[in-house]
């Protein structure tokens, strides 16, 4: 979906910016405008600095694909020469990796939105396509300056309305929600308080691998929870802390934890001591 979406954006949206300088920037803007709902629906968040990262990714992509294709063909006849060309691909992948890691270290790098409803996505695309059609009409009537400015303003307004619908989530006040997560043989309790605070109690499993990364974290992000105010640990059994350990290890890329609450230190076992040390290293 991401590849098809990027292609549609370049074909359908980018031409309206053809007379503007810095075409790489506008290509990135076009792609991000179209992919925004897809990213939110699939990953429950979007990267603020994605527009600028694409200024690195898009120009190098053609080099990467060409080097990969040429390297594959040459390696059929001359393996060492093919490996030398593949080195270029590895360098580009390293550039991508380090650029993304650097962007993640910047403030507000990720905006956790949760998974939007389908109707919100449809409304967003209706407003986006309407804005693009208006701007295309503006290109066809270049002589009508006043009319063109009105269409430009209206197009920006339409995209803004679409984004507002897509991003807006009504918060239900004076209500407590409690969700029991299916983590196999284990526990995982998510609580949202009436004041908007989020709590998580005993997240772990003894029979599901990487339960934190693949079950607990995706659920939290899908609900728009990018940060947990309190995480409570009752004791150190695997089916109570294995997922919490993963969340602690993924503080830079996953759900952040503000406070980790342990039982009294007199009942700590080795597992709880290890978790406490791990949390301290991550600044929790």
Predicted feature residues:
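Alpha-helical hydrophobic membrane-insertion segments
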Residues: 2-16, 122-126, 130, 134
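Alpha-helical transmembrane segments of multi-pass integral membrane proteins
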Residues: 4-108
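Non-globular, low-confidence helical/coil segments that flank catalytic cores
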Residues: 54, 65, 73-284
């Amino acid at each position: 979906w991401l590849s098809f979406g990027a292609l549609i954006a370049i074909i359908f949206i980018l031409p309206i910016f053809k007379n503007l300088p810095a075409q790489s920037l506008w290509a990135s803007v076009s792609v991000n405008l179209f992919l925004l709902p897809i990213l939110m629906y699939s990953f429950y968040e979007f990267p603020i600095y994605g527009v600028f990262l694409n200024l690195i990714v898009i120009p190098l992509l053609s080099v990467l694909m060409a080097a990969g294709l040429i390297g594959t063909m040459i390696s059929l006849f001359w393996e060492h020469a093919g490996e030398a060309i593949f080195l270029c691909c590895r360098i580009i992948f390293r550039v991508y990796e380090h650029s993304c890691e650097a962007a993640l270290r910047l403030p507000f790098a990720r905006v956790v939105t949760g998974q939007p409803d389908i109707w919100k996505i449809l409304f967003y695309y209706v407003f986006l396509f309407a804005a693009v059609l208006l701007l295309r009409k503006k290109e066809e009537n270049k002589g009508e300056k006043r009319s063109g400015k009105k269409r430009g303003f209206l197009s920006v307004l339409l995209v803004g309305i679409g984004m507002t619908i897509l991003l807006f989530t009504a918060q239900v006040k004076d209500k407590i929600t409690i969700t029991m997560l299916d983590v196999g043989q284990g526990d995982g309790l998510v609580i949202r308080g009436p004041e908007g605070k989020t709590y998580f109690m005993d997240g772990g499993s003894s029979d599901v691998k990487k339960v934190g990364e693949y079950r607990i974290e995706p659920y939290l992000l899908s609900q728009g929870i990018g940060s947990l105010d309190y995480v409570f640990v009752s004791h150190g059994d695997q089916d109570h802390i294995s997922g919490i350990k993963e969340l602690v290890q993924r503080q830079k890329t996953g759900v952040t934890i503000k406070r980790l609450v342990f039982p009294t230190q007199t009942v700590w076992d080795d597992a709880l001591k290890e978790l406490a040390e791990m949390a301290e290293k991550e600044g929790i």
